[in-house]
Amino acid sequence: MEKSCTIQDVFERFYPSYEKRNNPPSHHRKTAYHIMNCKTGAFGVNISVCEDCGCISVHNNSCRSRCCPMCQEFPKEKWIDAQKENVLDAPYYHVVFTVPEELNSIIYSNQKLLYDALYHVASATLNELSKDAKYLGADIGYICILHTWGSAMNYHPHIHTIVLGGGLDDENKWKETGGNFFLPYGVISKVFRGKYLDELKSLWNDSKLKFHGTAEKYQNSYRFKELLDKCYEKNWVTYCKETFNGAQSVINYLGKYTHRIAISNHRIKSMTDTTVTYVVKDYKNEGCWKEKIISGEEFIRRFMMHVPPKRFVRIRHYGLLSCRNKRKKITHCRNLLGCKKYISTLKNLNAVEMIKVLYHIDVCKCSSCGGNMVSPRKDKYSSSFHAHMRC
């Protein structure tokens, strides 16, 4: 049994056999190639030479895949830093929209179409209810982020929304209720359920849905109607996970959800020639962590379920926080609230400068003597370079 293994290790061992058995789509193959070759030199290298002692440093480039566990830190930090300019010192709420597991097979068969529908319906629900004077009577702003996994990497599509707890009324004045979240969860759940099932019905009537695997039975109109009726009868889980106040709290909180992948390296405990052991949350036992053992190919299959469609945008901004509105309207809200503007610290910085700001490491200094590290001149260091690369 091997200890301290990573997702890259698991893919290197089990993905080749998984690919032979399953013939995955091209974007899954690309993701696997990126994960297996990240920081191995396959994506190029950066060479630096010390001007004083001649020490050579070689840094293997990362793959930059959004599904790679080794490539999320920089995008996360840059994204969070960019949001500082749009965050207000006002209440924020974390609302989660989920769908019944009965819809999982249809959603997985139509990922791009029905993921987009999740965003659209969650947005329509929040907009409709927040504009109702009975609840708030204002235009609000929020960020939606799709996650498709549960703790065990099972398929569990749901939308995380970070909702600004106030907005602009018809007179362009700031309005908030204070205290608890301004929308009743039961009302949100019913409206979201109705809108999403109406969307499914419309797509089925327009013959836009595909049915694969266990979803094939829903090509039959009677079976599809039975499914919708069953989902109408269920209570859809919509809840507010946390309430927090203050810009810095929001900024710190955002990082937990924006650039997550299905599983991180630290949750993988070990692997054998045939199995992988990782830890999952046992929600039936107060959320305690427990170890789970599955076959290596099953681990790959579960991971691949959560690779997003090509060019799919997972983080979307709406209302006051949309690209069209945030420059003018957030500035107006800030003036009304008397908030100070948070200034980005990473804007326009390159990777070397970001490393220095975030980790206080100067990669331009030699680790041996403290001299300046520079890119080598081919005529002066070509022999040393080739000798190093052969090692």
Predicted feature locations:
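Beta->alpha loop/short-helix hinge microenvironment recognizer with preference
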Residues: M1-C391
